[in-house]
Amino acid sequence: MIKFSPSKLAQIKELLVLTLLGLLSALSGYLLLKEEANNYAIQNAYPIIQAYFNFTHTAHHPLNLLAIFVVPSLWLMALFAKRLLPRIIFDFLGALFMLRLIFGFVFVNVLIFLPAASPPLLLGQIVAYLPFFVMAWGWLMWRIDCSGQESPQQIITISEAHEPINSFDYYHASANCVINQGKSGFKGVTRLGQFLVLIHSLMLLDILGIALVRAYGLVQKML
């Protein structure tokens, strides 16, 4: 049985989170491809949909193809290399997913105002986006709160967490925000922390509101 040091185990856990974020991003792209095959909104020449489709679709985005080779290599290095992977690799991947988070948020909001967008397209994007949102914000809160700090909860506190705090508590708190219908489990200590918690809460309330409206609309059409 392979035994890992605490720092090596922490890197493996973080790489697992980033890999799951990549898979959720790929799921969003698959749903867009499915809509294109069904001749829905993708082929109706709306610039915002086409731009997002090009950003997400594997055939149009070389970074997605590159990930097919890079991610397995990172896993092999993380599992079998004695040295730790450079921190910049994780931060670079995390920054890409933060960009993806913003693109997805804008896309979901714009999509609701486009009459050609089918209800399954919007609802499917929301379903794929919510777990991505939870994990991406959990990673961001953990990274900022623990970066260069002697102990966690110097920038952001987690109301329901118990000592000792670890990365899981940030993902758990992010998920609870969705389960509790937008009630934030984070509290900012510094101005940066307060700003992040505010942005997180506003984005979450927006996504939950869109999901509720779209789900209600689908139920009305079924009745």
Where are these regions (language model features)?
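Membrane-proximal soluble regions of multi-pass membrane proteins
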Residues: C146-T190
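Cytosolic-side membrane-entry/anchor segment at the start of a transmembrane helix
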Residues: A59-F113
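Pore domain of cation channels
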Residues: F168-A173, K183-L223
